[in-house]
A protein has these predicted regions:
Chain A
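Non-transmembrane, membrane-proximal soluble domains of secreted or membrane proteins
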Residues: 2-3, 21-45, 59-61, 66-234
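Globin-like tetrapyrrole-binding proteins
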Residues: 51
Length: 234, 647
């Protein structure tokens, strides 16, 4: 029996190492460009560790059982009549409960942090219309722009508006996503941490041009942002 | 007492019950597909006339409105005509009109030749096979559509189809797979197996059962017919979000109405299962002696009956907005856009369990009998189904974390969503514990059950990611979702359907499938499934949204790999089809109980007698007493002679 447990654990470790390699050798997430996405990635890794453990456990038992207890198809004996084990059943009810509640708490904390606006965030209105995005910067007069420009390090609060059908504002490197819904005002916060060029993607099927409903997003320094605003205001 | 064989009374009908007409008369005016065809046409004409007369009476302009004519004429009146024509209502109409009915007439019961499968048949075993063959036909059609748009997606940019056709293919693929394959395929397996497992001669309402089946092809044809509608097939996704769906071309109506027919089919079948399971259990078959497949279908039927009216409502509201100019979901008229999503997901989340719980039942049967061990923790397995049922109704808004719904609703919905992992985890761990120290027979159904076990864990774990609101905000509406639902619905549901079809194939057909081809089918499917869907997690997280015909060229290589793998996945079905068809025709004759399983369906011949049991079985113990010396699930002798042994 002890030999069996060692073998089972060995299989579990091998599977766990393989799955961990898959998880870390590929870069599954885009490089974060916002504080919000940094926090989301922490939750992602929490869930990943949990998943690796659970998958390895189940896969190891399946592989071990088939390897150890497979019999020829014409074998006609029965296995031992084990109907259950209350202790085990309590354990595999309680442990997952603790794990998912822990994940729930971590998620709720991150959600609340990602939703808490600072005193004066940069106000940006994102307007979705088949099949283009428009951005308005209410703090700087009434100009609008087809490209999204944000200053690095400053929190921006997006207010979404949809002209016709539902669209969804998404920049993969920002990690944040929110639908723009006709008749409903929705908001989302983004605090860019690095400069660069990104794509605003519409993530909600909105019609024939949905796949091409994209806009350019640029995160620039505060000085460049001020310069850009001046040009736009002129 | 010995139950008399109901069929034996067949010959005793008085002569005046014999059909008085010539065979030509019967062909056109007797129940059947010919009468179904002309009565469908007549229904269409009548419905169209009704619309035109009413519209001109009220002097509405224009008198001819194609959408209204199609809804009333083609999608309500014609199907009703078809159902009347094939004879689905004959018995009830005879009864209502006071004409003689023949409650003991079993001429429409059971199959004596292949033609009996093409008419209204009240035998649950025939209906089960009707369901399975029909649903597999739609599985092939839906699969071909998937391969078609995977060909389009093999490279960025548009190559083969235009944008509306692409959206149509994606939408109809999902709709067929959900409403015409997974849900009814499970209904088909359960139709065949559940009455047998209960020790019942048939379902509680055999005529309703026949009607439930014939509603299904109507829905399927409606979804497919949307491709010939002006403007193309419905292209708002299977979710058909308003207000986008309300501005779609005519094809959208085919979705709105098709869902009604498929939904009616599900609801009627579910009611039938509930009444059958509650009232038709053999003596001694207490709830705690029912096989887990029966438990699973009991739970699923509760879900169907409670939830399905919500999708019917959501689609009627969209239809009303489209043709009656109401404003349920149009903000200009005071409608609430998110209302659609709340009502839709109040069905469509439980629908995920409707598409999974019957599979849980199948896997419990297969793993237990192929490991030669009792199901580990039988009662907790049944209770966890109930736990999923209850929790399943409290999680719908997790599909709406980025939809702009009330912020305060997100954390409670996240908690309930994550809690579902507990009963699901119990089931997964109990199956693995059932394997422990078993004597494992690695047959094809067992391979699919084990494939399910591992793939479903991946789908469940990606569900944990999506249950967490912050991760969902990043991953929602991307290919990560596509990967997740295919791990749940293909690696989960479809694998269990294959397991079930292989497992009960000898019982259904009386012949054995080819084990070698079955194994080829499994491994081809298993490998190509993973190569197809696993990389989708990656492209989704990296920034590829779902439902797009064009995408960032950075994802080109991976999408090419995915497309090639999807073709292999499609081709693997050929192995299954060849195996099933040739084995059905000339496979080796199967024994009554090739798996030496204990549940009741294996205690009768393969295929079972026309009324299942020549004598009513007396159930004396649990269904999974493998390895218990002298244990029996049932004794097939008259009830009063049976001795009770503790379960």
């Amino acid at each position: 029996m002890r030999k069996g447990i060692v073998q089972l654990v060995a299989i579990g470790v091998v599977i766990g190492v393989l799955v961990t390699l898959v998880a870390v050798l590929f870069q599954w997430l885009p490089t974060s460009a916002t504080e919000e996405f940094d926090r989301i990635q922490d939750v992602y890794w929490f869930a990943t560790v949990m998943s690796i453990v659970i998958f390895s456990l189940v896969a190891a038992v399946v592989v071990y059982a088939v390897w150890k207890w497979r019999v020829p198809l014409d074998d006609d004996a029965d296995g031992p009549p084990i109907h259950g084990h209350t202790g085990l059943e309590v354990v595999w009810t309680a442990v997952p409960a603790i794990l998912v509640i822990a994940l729930g708490i971590v998620s709720a904390v991150v959600l609340s942090e990602n939703g808490r606006a600072s005193d004066r965030p940069l106000q940006v209105k994102a307007i979705g219309q088949q099949f283009a995005w428009k951005f308005e910067y209410g703090d700087y007069g009434d100009f609008e722009s087809g490209e999204l420009v944000l200053p690095v390090g400053r929190e921006a609060q997006f207010t979404m508006e949809a002209v016709d059908v539902i669209h969804s504002f998404w920049v993969p490197q920002f990690g944040q996503k929110m639908d723009a819904v006709p008749g409903v005002e929705t908001t989302i916060l983004v605090t860019p941490t690095r400069t660069g060029e990104f794509a605003v993607i519409c993530a909600e099927l909105c019609g024939l041009g949905h796949a091409t409903m994209r806009a350019k997003a640029r995160v620039v320094t505060q000085a460049d942002f001020d310069k850009w605003v001046k040009e736009k205001q002129a | 007492m010995t139950a008399t064989h109901p069929d034996s009374s067949h010959a005793q009908y008085p002569p005046h019950f014999e059909p008085p007409h010539s065979s030509t008369w019967r062909l056109f005016f007797g129940p059947g597909l010919v009468r179904g065809a002309w009565m469908a046409a007549a229904g269409f004409v009548l419905g169209t006339l009704l619309v035109l007369v009413l519209r001109s009476w009220w002097s509405w302009d224009p008198v001819w409105n194609t959408e209204v004519v199609l809804v009333v004429g083609a999608m309500v009146a014609a199907p009703m005509g078809f159902l009347g024509g094939i004879g689905a209502f004959d018995y009830w109409l005879y009864y209502i009109s006071g004409r003689p009915t023949r409650p003991e007439d079993h001429s429409g019961h059971g199959a004596r030749g292949w033609r009996d499968y093409f008419r209204v048949n009240t035998d649950h075993k025939v209906i089960g096979i009707q369901y399975l063959v029909t649903t597999f036909v739609f599985f092939v059609i839906g699969g071909l559509m998937a391969m078609f748009f995977r060909a389009e997606l093999a490279q960025p940019g548009l190559q083969f189809v235009d944008s509306q056709t692409f959206n149509g293919l994606v939408s109809v693929h999902a709709t067929l797979m959900i409403f015409l394959f997974i849900i009814p395929a499970f209904a088909g397996i359960a139709n065949f197996v559940v009455p047998l497992m209960l020790g019942a001669p048939d379902m509680a309402f055999p005529r309703l059962n026949a009607l439930s089946f014939w509603l299904l092809p109507i829905a399927g044809i409606m979804f497919l017919a949307s491709f010939i509608a002006p403007g193309g097939a419905f292209g708002a996704g299977w979710t058909g979000y308003a207000p986008f769906a309300e501005g779609q071309p005519l094809g959208q109506t085919f979705f709105n109405m098709g869902v009604q027919w498929a939904g009616a089919s599900s609801i009627l079948t579910a009611l039938n299962f509930l009444v059958t399971i509650i009232t038709m259990r053999a003596p001694g078959m207490t709830f705690w002696r029912m096989p887990l497949l029966v438990w699973a279908n009991f739970t699923t039927s509760l879900l169907v009956v409670i939830a399905t009216p919500f999708i019917a409502g959501s689609q009627f509201f969209v239809l009303f907005d489209r043709i009656l100019h109401t404003s349920f979901f149009t903000p200009e008229g005071g409608g609430y856009v998110l209302g659609y999503q709340h009502v839709f997901w109040f069905y469509s989340h439980p629908a995920v369990y409707i598409m999974m719980l019957p599979g849980f039942g199948i896997v419990s049967e297969v793993i237990s009998s192929m490991s030669r061990k009792p199901v580990f923790g039988y009662r907790l397995m049944a209770l966890s189904l109930m736990g999923i049922l209850v929790l399943g109704f409290s999680v719908w808004a997790h599909h709406m974390f980025v939809a702009g719904m009330a912020d305060w609703l997100r954390v409670p919905m996240m908690i309930t969503t994550l809690l579902i992992a507990i009963p699901t985890g119990i089931k997964v761990f109990s199956w693995t514990a059932t394997l422990w120290q078993g004597r494992i027979h690695l047959t094809t159904p067992m391979l699919f059950a084990l494939g399910f076990l591992t793939m479903f864990v991946i789908g469940g774990l990606s569900g944990i990611y999506l249950g967490s609101v912050p991760i969902d905000i990043a991953a929602s509406d991307t290919y990560f979702i596509v990967a997740h639902i295919h791990y749940v619905l293909f690696g989960g549901s479809v694998f269990t359907i294959f397991a079930g079809v292989y497992y009960w194939f000898p019982k259904m057909t009386g012949r054995m499938y080819d084990e070698r081809l079955g194994k080829w089918h499994f491994w081809l499917t298993f490998v190509s499934f993973n190569v197809t869907f696993f990389p989708m997690h990656y492209v989704g997280l990296r920034g590829m949204p779902r439902r797009v015909f064009d995408y960032d060229s950075a994802f080109g290589d991976l999408n090419f790999v995915i497309s090639i793998a999807s073709f292999v996945l499609g081709a693997s079905f050929i192995v299954f089809a060849y195996n099933v068809i040739t084995s059905w025709v000339r496979g080796p004759v199967a024994e009554a109980n090739p798996w030496r399983a204990h549940s009741l369906e294996w205690q009768v011949s393969s295929p079972p007698p026309i009324f299942n049991f020549d004598e009513i079985p007396q159930v004396v113990g649990g269904p999974y007493e493998y390895g218990v010396p002298g244990a029996r699930h049932a004794v097939m002798s008259p009830a009063r002679e049976a001795k009770e042994v503790p379960a």
